[in-house]
Amino acid sequence: MSTASNRVSTQIVDEHKQFNNELPKFMQSVGLLDAGFNYHVVAVLGSQSTGKSTLLNNLFGTSFSVMDASKRQQTTKGIWLSKANNSPILVMDVEGTDGRERGEDQDFERKSALFSISTSEVIIVNMWENQVGLYQGSNMALLKTVLEVNLQLFHNKKERCLLQFVIRDFLGNTSMENLADTIMTDLNNIWASLSKPEGFENSVINDFFDVGFTGLPHKILCSDAFSEAVDSLRERFVDNNNSDYIFNVSYHKKIPADGFSLYTREIWDTIENNKDLDLPTQQQLLAQYRCDEIITEVMEPFSTACTILQKEFLPGNLCKDLPTKLLNMFETVIEAYDRQASRYNVHIYQKKKQELIASVDSHLYVFFQAQLNALHKELIKSFFDASNEFPSDTPFKESSSIKINELVNKMREEGESLSLPHVHWDVDPFILKLSEELTQNSETLCKEKLKEKLEELFTGFEFEVSEAVEVAFQKLSHNVWDTLLNEFLAAQNTTIEKIKNIVPFYVDIDDTKTTEEYIINFKKNSWLFFRKKIDSEMSEVLLQQRLRVYFEELFRYDSDGMPKLWKKSGTIDRDYRESLTKTLDLINVLASIKVSDGNYPDLNVDIKTLEPEYTSPASFFTILNRRRVSDISVNFKRSADLIFMDCKRSVINTTTRIPPYFWVLLIVLGWNEFMAILRNPFVFMILMFGGTVVYGLYISGLIWPAKMVLERATNNLVDLATDRFSNTYQEQVQQRAMQRTEKSGSPVASADDAEAEKTALS
C-alpha cells in the first residue's frame, strides 16, 4: 500500500510474482465490493521509465509511486491496483518492460501482459512519439505478446478489447493520423505473422481489437496543454454521455466486483503455474465458487430467521401471519442471492439458484407442514364442536357433509396461502388426510348420536314398560297379561315410529335396510327387557307376597273393600275355599304369558336371534315351569292355611258367650266398687283412656297383635325381675356361707348349704 490509511492503492502481484490475498479488503475499502458490473478495469503497459505511473496519477487521480527524475531506476515493481478518483474504475499499473533489473528475463513481461489482457477492458499502451516506428522502442515485442495472448484466450468468444495508444510528448510535427497509420501497419504485420487457430486464418486485428490513439504534449514544457489533453482524455473515461466514451459494453469481462478478487487470484495462479489459461472455464469456476459463497452468506440470516420463527410455534398451535412471514423470508433470501449472484455465469447462477430454492424449500416446508398439522387438529376440534349445534330439522349426514366441505376448503385455502414462488408444496395429502378423518369422525358421530337417541328412546320405553309391569303386579288379576301386553305393544309401536323418524337423520335417506335393522334390534331388545322385567317382578319372595295380598283381599275383604265379619264358621270355610281356588288359578295364569284366547303373543322377530335358551315362543313366554308352579302352590297354601286358622280362631273366640247370670252377679257384688271408681276422677279417667285404646285396637283389628306384644313385654319384665332377684339372693347366700365358714371352719358344709339353697331357689 502506498497510502495505508485509506488504502488508495495496493500491490496485487509483487516483484516475486506472489499474489496479494488482501485484495478483498482493498475492494471493500474503496467501496466497489458491491458494485456488481458497475465498474471498469484499465491496465497500462509500456517501457520502463516512460511515465506510466505519472500518466495514471494525472488521468485518474491515483497515487502510484513515480520515478525520481534524478534517478533513472525502476519504481513500479510487480502489478499495482488503485481506484480512480470519483469514478468506479480500477486502474492497474503494470511493471514496465525492457527494465535492466530483469534483463533478458521476459517471463514476468509475458505473464503480466497475459494477466492484464485477461482482466482489463482497456489496455493503455504508453509510448514516446520518437519511439513510433521502432520495433523495440515502440513496444512492438510487447504488443506481439498481447496479440498472441488475446488470440489464444478469446478466439472462441471473440471478446473485444481496446488498445488505447497514448503518444507522449506529442509535438504535432507529424500528424496523429500518420503516427496512427505507422502503428497500425506494425500491428497488422505482427498479426499476419501470428499462428492463428483453425478457422481464423483470414482474420484481421480489428476482429478482436479496437485501437485508439491519443497524443499528449510534454508534461513539463507544455504543462497547460498537457493538463488540457489529460482532462479531455479523462472525460472519455468517466463521462458515459461523451460521444468518444471509451468503455464499450463489449469490453466488460462480466466479472462482478465481489468476485474480482477471486477471479484475478485464480487467473494469476493459472498463469504462474504455466497452465493453459481457459478464461471461460475460469469464469465458470468463479461463478460456481462465488455462488456457493453467496448461498452460504444469505443462508446465515435465513437460518437465524428460521430459528426465531420456530420459537413462535407452540406445540399444536397455529402461527399467526405465517404466510406473510414465510414469503418475506423466502423473498429476502432469494433477492439477496439474486442481487449478488445474477452477475455471474447465467447457467451457473440459475443452477445454484435452484439449489438454494431447494434448500430454502426444505427449511420452510417444516413450517408449512407444522402449520397444516396444527390446522388439522383445530379443524377436527371445530367439527366436533359444530356437530353439537347442527340444526335439528336437517339430517345429520347433510349438515356433516356441508361442514366437512367447509373445513376442507379452509385447509386448501391455508395451504395455497402458504405457497411460495417457484416452490410447489402439495397440499393434497393434507386435504386427503383431513377429509378421511373428518368423514370417519362424521360416521362415528352419526353412530354415537344415533345411539344416544336410540338409548334415550329405549330408556323412555323401559320406564313406561317398567311402570306398567309394576302397577299390574301390584294388583294382580286373571287378565293381567292382556293388560300388560296391550300397554307393552302400544309403547313398542310408538317407539318404532319414533325410530323410523330418527334413523334417516343419521343415515342415508334411501338406506331403508339400516332402518329396518335398528327396528328389528329394538324389537329384540324390547321383548328381552319385557321378559327380564317380568322375571324380576315374579321372583319367589315377591310372588309369594303378592299372592298372599291377592288371597287376603279375596278372603278378608268383600267386593266393596270392607273387612268381613264372620259370625258362623261355615261362612269362613266357604270364603276360604273360594279364595284359595282363585289364587291357585292365578298361579297357573301367571305361569305363561298368554292372551285371553290362550295363545302366545306374536313376537314379530326370529326367536332364535333372542337368546340361546329360547328355542320356541313357548320357552320364551313360559315364566314358571311345572315344578315351580307346584312349589309356589304348596308354599302359598301353607301361608293361606295360617291365615285361615287365625281367622277361624278369632271367630270361635267371638262366638263363645258368657252366661247372662254372670253379669247380674257382677253388678250386685261389684256395685260398691263401681261407684268408688265413678266417684274417683283420676281412676275414672284412666279407665276411660284404657277403654278407648282397647276399642280402637278392636276396631282396627289390632287387638290380637297388641295382646301378643303385651304378653311378650310382661314375660320380659318377669324374666328380668327374676334374674335380678336370683343374683341378689345368690350373693346373700355366699356371704352367709362365708360367715359360717369363719365360725365353724367347715367349708364343705357351707358349700353344701349354699348349693341346697340355690337348688331350692330354682
From Swiss-Prot:
Its main location: endoplasmic reticulum. The modification Phosphoserine is found at residue 746. Residues 36-251 form the GB1/RHD3-type G domain. Pfam families: RHD3_GTPase, Sey1_3HB. Its EC number is 3.6.5.-. PROSITE patterns: G_GB1_RHD3. InterPro entries: G_GB1_RHD3_dom, P-loop_NTPase, RHD3/Sey1, Sey1/RHD3-like_3HB. Keywords: Endoplasmic reticulum, GTP-binding, Hydrolase, Membrane, Nucleotide-binding, Phosphoprotein, Transmembrane, Transmembrane helix. Residues 736-762 are annotated as: Disordered. It is found in: Endoplasmic reticulum membrane. It comes from the Eukaryota. GO terms for cellular component: cytoplasm; cytosol; endoplasmic reticulum; endoplasmic reticulum membrane. GO terms for molecular function: GTP binding; GTPase activity. GO terms for biological process: endoplasmic reticulum membrane fusion; endoplasmic reticulum organization. GTP binds at residues 46-53. The chain crosses the membrane at residues 658-678, 682-702. It is a multi-pass membrane protein. The keyword Nucleotidyltransferase does not apply. Cooperates with the reticulon proteins and tubule-shaping DP1 family proteins to generate and maintain the structure of the tubular endoplasmic reticulum network. Has GTPase activity, which is required for its function in ER organization. Belongs to the TRAFAC class dynamin-like GTPase superfamily. GB1/RHD3 GTPase family. RHD3 subfamily. PANTHER family: PROTEIN SEY1 (PTHR45923:SF2). Interacts with sad1. This is Protein sey1. It comes from Schizosaccharomyces pombe (strain 972 / ATCC 24843) (Fission yeast).
